[in-house]
Amino acid sequence: MWNSSDANFSCYHESVLGYRYVAVSWGVVVAVTGTVGNVLTLLALAIQPKLRTRFNLLIANLTLADLLYCTLLQPFSVDTYLHLHWRTGATFCRVFGLLLFASNSVSILTLCLIALGRYLLIAHPKLFPQVFSAKGIVLALVSTWVVGVASFAPLWPIYILVPVVCTCSFDRIRGRPYTTILMGIYFVLGLSSVGIFYCLIHRQVKRAAQALDQYKLRQASIHSNHVARTDEAMPGRFQELDSRLASGGPSEGISSEPVSAATTQTLEGDSSEVGDQINSKRAKQMAEKSPPEASAKAQPIKGARRAPDSSSEFGKVTRMCFAVFLCFALSYIPFLLLNILDARVQAPRVVHMLAANLTWLNGCINPVLYAAMNRQFRQAYGSILKRGPRSFHRLH
């Protein structure tokens, strides 16, 4: 069983004497990569003007949780695996356990907020700026930390060193049923909700794309001479300008059009997100109501030629957010399944340690995903690394 007295801080076992060096090496990589990557991410969000959006505060919050883990907690995990002994006492073992689960819960809650934001952006664009207003998003971010700490603080007396994973965690036996409920809420309900949101986003995008294709065909059949203008007469577009959200002003070139666009904001800052995000019902209504004369008189809308690129940007940002969620879920699934299927710890201790060490990945992988899947983050990272200390002048 995962049980030990508070005075026992040893996780020594002959079967893991060789494996501990693998764990230590992996832990050092996670600590260094995660610290550097997450610091770069925070600097990029602060320095790059196009990344300074309210929605990107969610990314900053996720980054802070990862930075807390990689910089403060991971070195102690490495030390414990190296010596197979927790060397910093019972009190800090409790602090470690509380911060460990608090950072994980903040990450899960933030992933939920990101998925919710992407869904509202495409399905309920008028509701998006209301939910993610300046006050709303600050309240949401503060709430993630308050809820995360408050939910695991009651376990303070039962945080111990769990020998089978050589980590300070809560005592599984003494923590029941509270810990079982908490794990179910965060890892089952929370992560499932994120997955459902992305499924809904995919379905909405697919429907919108079909509706747009039908609309274009309708417009082409009405007047063949205006085929080139069908994209310019699209039934709606999302323009994501954070400054206009903050001021409450109308989007450029939209107020005079028969179909209003939803002004929103995303991880891409000032980029527009178009086309695929159209509501299918609105597209069909527009196709049915638009007479030939209206089509013939349709005038180009400023920025409409960027629609395909903007639509692509929405897809790229959403895929990046989904990749972050997927990596988090995949890093924890083996650990969670092993704890459920092997509650009596019959499997070799090395297997439990491998599963636990895989969860370290979620603390350092996000900056890699941002760099690989987001052009603006990639450029910001490059600029900071090239300019060095001179990059900080942009903060003044």
Swiss-Prot record:
Record topology, Extracellular segments: 1-26, 79-94, 166-180, 342-352
Name the record gives this protein: G-protein coupled receptor 84
Compartments, as annotated in UniProt: Cell membrane
Similarity annotation: Belongs to the G-protein coupled receptor 1 family.
Glycosylation sites: N3, N8
Record has Protease as a keyword: no
PTM per Swiss-Prot/TrEMBL: Phosphorylated by a subset of GPR84-activating ligands. Constitutively phosphorylated at Ser-221 and Ser-224 in the absence of 2-HTP. By contrast, Thr-263 and Thr-264 are phosphorylated only following prior cell treatment with 2-HTP.
Biased composition (Low complexity): 247-260
Gene: GPR84
InterPro entries listed in its UniProt record: GPCR_Rhodpsn (IPR000276), GPCR_Rhodpsn_7TM (IPR017452)
Region Disordered, residue ranges: 244-311
Gene Ontology cellular-component terms listed: plasma membrane; receptor complex; specific granule membrane; tertiary granule membrane
Function according to Swiss-Prot or TrEMBL: G protein-coupled receptor that responds endogenously to dietary fatty acids or nutrient, specifically medium-chain free fatty acid (FFA) with carbon chain lengths of C9 to C14. Capric acid (C10:0), undecanoic acid (C11:0) and lauric acid (C12:0) are the most potent agonists. In immune cells, functions as a pro-inflammatory receptor via 6-OAU and promotes the expression of pro-inflammatory mediators such as TNFalpha, IL-6 and IL-12B as well as stimulating chemotactic responses through activation of signaling mediators AKT, ERK and NF-kappa-B.
Biological processes annotated in GO: neuropeptide signaling pathway
Provenance organism: Homo sapiens
Induction: By bacterial lipopolysaccharides (LPS) in the monocytic leukemia cell line THP-1.
Residue spans crossing the bilayer: 27-47, 58-78, 95-115, 145-165, 181-201, 321-341, 353-373
Pfam families xrefs: 7tm_1
The protein's assembly and partners: Interacts with ARRB2 and ARR3.
PANTHER family (alphabetical): G-PROTEIN COUPLED RECEPTOR, G-PROTEIN COUPLED RECEPTOR 84
Swiss-Prot/TrEMBL keywords: Cell membrane, G-protein coupled receptor, Glycoprotein, Membrane, Phosphoprotein, Receptor, Transducer, Transmembrane, Transmembrane helix
GO terms, molecular function: urotensin II receptor activity
UniProt note on tissues of expression: Expressed predominantly in hematopoietic tissues. High levels detected in the bone marrow and lower levels in the peripheral leukocytes and lung. Also expressed in brain, heart, muscle, colon, thymus, spleen, kidney, liver, placenta and intestine. Within the leukocyte population expression is higher in neutrophils and eosinophils relative to T- or B-lymphocytes.
